[in-house]
Amino acid sequence: MPNNQECATLLNQWIRFFRNGHIGVNYIGKTKKGEKVTEQNKQPIEKDLNPLNSTKPLFEKINENTVYLRIPDFEISEKKAIDSLILANRATILSTENFIIDVRNNPGGSDASYSSLIPFLYTQPIRTVGALFYSTDLNNQRMLELSQNPDFDEESKKTFKNYYEKLQANKGEYVDLFNKKVNITKMDTIQPYPKNIGIVINENNGSTTEQFLLTAMQSKKVKLYGRTTKGMLDISNVNIVTSPCGDIELYYGLSKSYRIPDFPVDDIGLQPDVFIDKTIDPLNWLNFVRDHLNGK
C-alpha cells in the first residue's frame, strides 16, 4: 500500500460493499497540502440558496405569513446556538402561520440539539422507539466521554454516567438503557401557531436528522418537502477510534433500533410528503415550499 490515505480509501470501498451507514474510516493525517481529508467532507454538497452555505443556524421572516429557520448541523456543539436563535425568535414563530425548517445537508449529531423545536411541532403524544447498545469496554468509553462533555447540561451528564455504569455491569450483552422499547412524550400545550410546518429535506440527511424527522412526522402540522433521505439510522450512536499510527479513524455504530426489521430506515431513507422533482431548480426550492404552504 503506497500510503495511509490510499489505505483509508480502499478500506471504505470494501466497507461500502457491506453497508453504507454509520461505519467507515476517515483519513485524518496530513495531505501534501497540509489539509485533513475525511470521507464526509469529500461528499458533494448540493448548490442551492445562500442559506445552505451557512455553517451556523439562521432565522428569517420571509413574508407576513412565513418564517424560515436553517439548521445545517445537529452536533451537540451547535445546541446553544440553535436554542438561542429559537428563543430570540420564539414570539415571531408563535405568531406566524407558516414555519419552514430547512435541514438539507444536515448529517446528524445529537438528539438534544433539536429538543427546542418540539414544542412548535407538537400536536399529540410522540412515540420514540428505543434501541439496544452493545456493551464492551471500548464501546462504553463513548458514554463516559459524553458524561464529561461540557456541551451537555448537568442532568444529561449525570444520565450518561448512569448509562455507562449500567453498560459496564453487562459487558458482552445488548443492553436496553431505557428499560422500555418505546418512550412516549406528552406535552401540556398545543400551540395554535404555526399552523403549517414544512421541513425541507434531501439525500444528505441521516442519523439524528432522520430521528428528528421520525419525531416531526407524528405531528398533524408537519409535511416533509424535498427528496428521500440517506437512510442511516437503524444502527446508530457512533463511536470513533483512532488507529495506532494516528492517521486513520474508524467510526461505527454502537446500537440497533427496536424498529428493525419491521420499519427499516438504513439504505432506504425517509420519503417526503411532497417530492421536489428535478424540473424545479434548487434555487427555487424554498419558493416552492413557501408557495405550497400558502396554498398557491
Whereabouts are the PLM-identified features?
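Flexible, glycine-rich surface segments
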Residues: 146-149, 158-229, 234-236
